[in-house]
């Protein structure tokens, strides 16, 4: 399978993304010689990976933006027939140790969300995976108010992690950003800070954008 050359500039990336609008996932997969899964229960990241590949994303699983040379992160977002997000959006793994001196400005969440190319995809479960169509993409940069909301949530969450209270953090914490266990296997474990400052074992956590926030982003663009 021939790999796609990364886009040279922002206009080329947007052109590629706009050319996908209205196309089904099966059309892209067939063109690339990729099998379409019957469902996404075991292939949760399949849609995102397919679109990353088609657009020529470079990051893979590295902790950096998908198009680092353009300063753009790619996010596919499953939507219902009213254009509303169907699930939260994964941003990145949350650091649970060695966080002394970490600030919002030098955090991976801030880096990833500086500029995002949102690609909506039909996500209603009654639509077979291959028949789901890609929507119109939009390039988003957080405005000062959105940036402030993200920073406030991140700082509050990180403060609780630093105090050894990661177990007390639930998906309800945060107005726009939440912390949740991040592992397909609940037996996966990693180190975190305990309340007495020593290390303990816990499930890995990830940062996610809440659906109300992503709905607001899409609504600003598409009304």
Swiss-Prot record:
CDD domains membership: MutH-like
Gene3D superfamilies per UniProt: DNA mismatch repair MutH/Restriction endonuclease, type II (3.40.600.10)
Gene Ontology CC, one term: cytoplasm
UniProt keyword annotation of Calcium present: no
Keyword tRNA-binding (UniProt): no
Pfam families registered for this protein in UniProt: MutH
Role noted for this protein: Sequence-specific endonuclease that cleaves unmethylated GATC sequences. It is involved in DNA mismatch repair.
Family per record: Belongs to the MutH family.
Protein name per its UniProtKB record: DNA mismatch repair protein MutH
Gene: mutH
């Amino acid at each position: 399978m021939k790999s796609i050359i990364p886009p040279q500039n922002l206009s080329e990336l947007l052109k590629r993304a706009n050319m996908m609008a209205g196309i089904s996932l099966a059309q892209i997969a067939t063109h690339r010689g990729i099998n379409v899964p019957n469902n996404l229960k075991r292939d949760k990241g399949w849609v995102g990976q397919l679109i990353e590949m088609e657009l020529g994303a470079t990051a893979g699983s590295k902790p950096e933006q998908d198009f680092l040379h353009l300063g753009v992160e790619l996010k596919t977002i499953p939507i219902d027939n009213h254009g509303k997000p169907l699930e939260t959006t994964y941003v990145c793994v949350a650091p649970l140790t060695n966080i002394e001196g970490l600030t919002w400005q030098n955090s991976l969440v801030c880096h990833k969300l500086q500029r995002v190319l949102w690609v909506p995809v039909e996500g209603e479960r009654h639509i077979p995976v291959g028949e789901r169509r890609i929507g119109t993409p939009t390039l988003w940069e957080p405005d000062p108010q959105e940036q402030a909301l993200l920073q406030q949530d991140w700082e509050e969450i990180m403060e609780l992690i630093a105090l050894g209270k990661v177990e007390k953090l639930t998906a309800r914490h945060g107005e726009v950003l939440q912390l949740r266990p991040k592992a397909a296997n609940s037996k996966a474990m990693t180190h975190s800070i305990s309340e007495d400052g020593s290390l303990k074992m816990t499930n890995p956590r990830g940062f996610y954008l809440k659906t109300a926030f992503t709905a607001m982003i899409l609504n600003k663009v598409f009304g």
